[in-house]
């Protein structure tokens, strides 16, 4: 793709000035980015796949050191003679005023008795100017089953960013960095803190808030925002400034942001150090979570009561002829629920869905409550179509020791319910 503006033209020109990858960098990639094996035969003859040297290991083992090249190897019992490995790696460097992340493919071929042959191929480069503006110089990506299929014969040119280049940018990075003065000034100290370079570098160059978090050592909070989108930082920045002003270190970014959200919902002052700088973050988080849950429960009860009042008239028109039905065997008393409010109270006390599932609005269902000594024991649903008990549930939908007795009492008095239905 041809460069479309001055920025892309300047970057393309600068990319031609980059030095080839050094032998030291290639050696690091070979040593750190791929697996190293010793192939062992059943009788103990072992071959280092790095240098081709053979020796005998009497007893099976998981790892060993090659006596010839000193490589630390994983011992693998196999008759295989060849192995091929590929791995991406990256190098952070600077070119003129630009920060550059170079991406390489390391391809290694190993064969028994031979020294390893390897080569590196440059896939592409991420370029950023001092303001964090980005462009990509890379080989062309081709269509295929895998995201990282490239046309290695294509020229290095300006490309659109895509998942293939982003995928490679997550690869291991050479530990010796060369950075621009601007990036160094903005707080970068040769540590990405497990944040992808393609996310941290442009953020650090373009967003002063990221610079502030990095310089103040608020790394857990910085990682949280980088992993969850920097847009959300706006909602918390005023509270973050309170923490910075009071020298408060946020040990868990996710937990702290959750706590601030809960404080906001509870109507607390999130600009007050008393709330946003707790001595024990986890204890404070759990405390406000409990308070928010209690508030939500109160709001739900109010909402349900309002719904019950609105549904009350319709329920009376639908089931009024059954009101007053009550029977007992001397131990258990069973009566029909005569209002939506009673359905709400029954569902709350018994911890089931008789109210939430709107049983009061079902024209062919009639709900009864079974009690013993004034305490609820089971809730019964009767079908007005079949005049049979559909279900009878105790607390948390479990059957009680009185379950069969309740069913027998319901069956004995089903004629009374049927008479009311036909009246």
Name each model-derived stretch.
Residues 1-312:
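Sequence-structural signature of the catalytic-core scaffold of metal-dependent phosphohydrolases
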């Amino acid at each position: 793709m041809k460069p479309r503006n001055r920025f892309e033209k300047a970057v393309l020109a600068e990319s031609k000035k980059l030095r080839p990858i050094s032998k030291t960098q290639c050696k690091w990639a070979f040593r750190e980015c791929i697996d190293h094996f010793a192939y062992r035969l059943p009788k103990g003859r072992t071959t280092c796949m790095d240098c081709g040297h053979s020796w005998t290991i009497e007893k099976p083992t998981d790892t060993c050191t090659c006596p010839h090249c000193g490589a630390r190897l994983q011992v693998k019992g196999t008759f295989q003679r060849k192995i091929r490995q590929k791995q991406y790696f990256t190098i952070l460097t600077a070119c003129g005023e630009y920060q550059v992340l170079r991406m390489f493919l390391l391809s290694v071929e190993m064969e028994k008795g031979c020294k390893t042959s390897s080569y590196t191929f440059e896939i592409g480069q991420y370029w950023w100017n001092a303001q964090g503006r980005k462009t990509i110089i890379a080989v062309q990506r081709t269509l295929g089953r895998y995201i990282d299929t490239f046309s290695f014969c294509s020229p290095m040119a300006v490309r659109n960013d895509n998942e293939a280049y982003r995928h490679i940018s997550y690869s291991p990075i050479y530990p010796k960095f060369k950075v621009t003065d601007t990036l160094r000034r903005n707080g970068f100290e040769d540590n990405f803190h497990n944040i992808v370079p393609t996310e941290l570098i442009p953020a650090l160059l373009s967003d002063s808030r990221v610079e502030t978090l990095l310089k103040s050592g608020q790394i857990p909070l910085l990682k949280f925002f980088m992993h969850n989108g920097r847009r959300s930082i706006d909602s918390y920045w005023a509270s973050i400034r309170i923490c910075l002003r009071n020298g408060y270190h946020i040990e868990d970014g996710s937990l702290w942001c959750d706590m601030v959200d809960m404080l906001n919902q509870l109507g607390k002052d999130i600009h007050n150090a008393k709330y946003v700088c707790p001595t024990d973050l986890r204890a404070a988080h759990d405390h406000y979570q409990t308070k928010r849950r209690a508030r939500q429960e109160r709001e739900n009860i109010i909402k349900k009561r309002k719904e019950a009042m609105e549904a009350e008239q319709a329920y009376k028109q639908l089931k009024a002829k059954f009101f007053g039905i009550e029977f007992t065997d001397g131990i258990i008393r069973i009566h029909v629920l005569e209002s939506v409010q009673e359905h709400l109270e029954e569902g709350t006390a018994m911890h089931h869905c008789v109210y939430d599932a709107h049983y009061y609005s079902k024209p062919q269902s009639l709900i009864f409550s079974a009690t013993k000594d004034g305490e609820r024991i089971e809730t019964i649903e009767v079908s007005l179509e079949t005049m049979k008990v559909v279900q009878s549930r105790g607390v948390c939908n479990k059957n009680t020791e009185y379950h069969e007795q309740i069913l027998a009492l319901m069956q004995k008095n089903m004629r009374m319910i049927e008479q009311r239905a036909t009246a």
